[in-house]
Amino acid sequence: MRKPLLTAALLATAAWTIPVRAQQIDLSDKIRLNGYSNFEFEYMPSKAGRGDGNASFDAQEFDLVFNIIPTDRLRVNADMRWEHGVATEDSRGNAAISHAFAEYTVRDALRLRAGKILLPFGIYNEIHTAKPAIFLYKEPFAVYKTEKLGGVRRFQPRSGAGLEALGSGGLGGVDADYTVLVVNGETTGKKDPFEEDDNRAKSLTARFRVHPASWVMLGTSYYHDQLTEFDATGKDTGRRTRQSSYVQSLELSPGPVLVQGEWARGNVTPSSAPGTDMEGWYAVASVMLLDRYRPYVELQHFDPSRKLANDEVRIVSPGVNLRMDGGLYLKFQVDKYHSLPANTRFKGVDYTELTAAVAVAF
């Protein structure tokens, strides 16, 4: 009987002491919780086209962002995301960790990260889930979601597991920042790229930006990876498909005016077949009125293969972003799609889609 009594006593002691110790640790200044949500609507009035003819609502995402700061130099950041009304018992929606990393600051010019990290590619990839931070209805597909415009692959994946070095400082009297990220890269087989690579080659992403003036940003980003090629039985052939992409970025923000533009090119080359050269760009001009209304016009162009003719697609999108209250934003945008007959997705069928969103940051 002594052992059960001793066990009970130990459990009682633990139950008594653990809450006391927890009360002695004040984490109020160490943990910060933020988040955002996004609700969307899309409708294509015409009968022909690749838009949504059913006028659908989409509970697009709900995110919680944790910043844990154990010391002045150490930070842990994670974004937990639930998409499309996730319900696991019904196999609906998606739940994911958008990113989760530990960051150690050596100095302003050098911070080190390890974990699951969003690729520092262009203006929007690192913030693509944070819809309240994007005044457009969505990030431009011509650079960030090229598969939706007939591309064989995106210019870059969203994220990867690996190590990152980044920093900021002055360069000849001009503000500048850089980022270099090495991750497992994309896997083309069954392996989880956030757990295990399927070849020895690592993916490299790098970005460099300068600010010649407070209202001017010039940037360039580069991405490279080697993808494993498998045979019909799923065995690694030892051959690799090479992918390289780069994007040039420009942002001008004099006063209430905001102008953004990016131009990207990429190549996907299998070991024993001709490669595919993709090209995409967008430009958007907007103005802030009364610190609340931001009307804008966006133009996108994407060429899925520069070696093929008549496969381009162009999108013209007038819209407006309304800041209603604090972190509450309403977005209205009209997307006018025009494509040429050889485009594998749109096949030359033009159409217009009406879109709207309710984005909240908290």
Where are these regions (language model features)?
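Transmembrane beta-barrel architecture of outer-membrane proteins
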Residues: 60, 82, 96-98, 184, ...
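Outer-membrane beta-barrel "beta-signal"
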Residues: 322, 327, 348-362
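Detector for outer-membrane/organellar transmembrane beta-barrel domains
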Residues: 209-305
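Sec/Tat signal peptide C-region and signal peptidase I cleavage site
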Residues: 16-22
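Outer membrane beta-barrel
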Residues: 24-44, 53-185, 200-202, 209-217, ...
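Sequence/structural signature of outer-membrane beta-barrel proteins
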Residues: 40-49, 81-88, 121, 183-194, ...
